[in-house]
Amino acid sequence: MIHLIASDIDGTLLQGGQTRLDPALFDVIERLEQHGIRFAAASGRQYTNLRRLFAPVADKIDYICENGSLVISDGSVLYKR
């Protein structure tokens, strides 16, 4: 069973200079949550930048940010370097 889906942002969910995520992605994240599957945004970007980018679902996803030096789940820091 799948418990977590993680995705890179730049060059994957955002392509060709896009600055906003496709709103359909937020619906997908909501549906994943309904099935007990977590979504994690993985990026070199800073945490605050990712929260703004994922604003509609910001409190429902996990973050692997700052090139892996900060990991946050359910608002708690799991790893910081």
Per-segment meaning from a language model:
Residues 1-2, 8, 60, 66:
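A structure-centric signal for secondary-structure junctions around beta-strands
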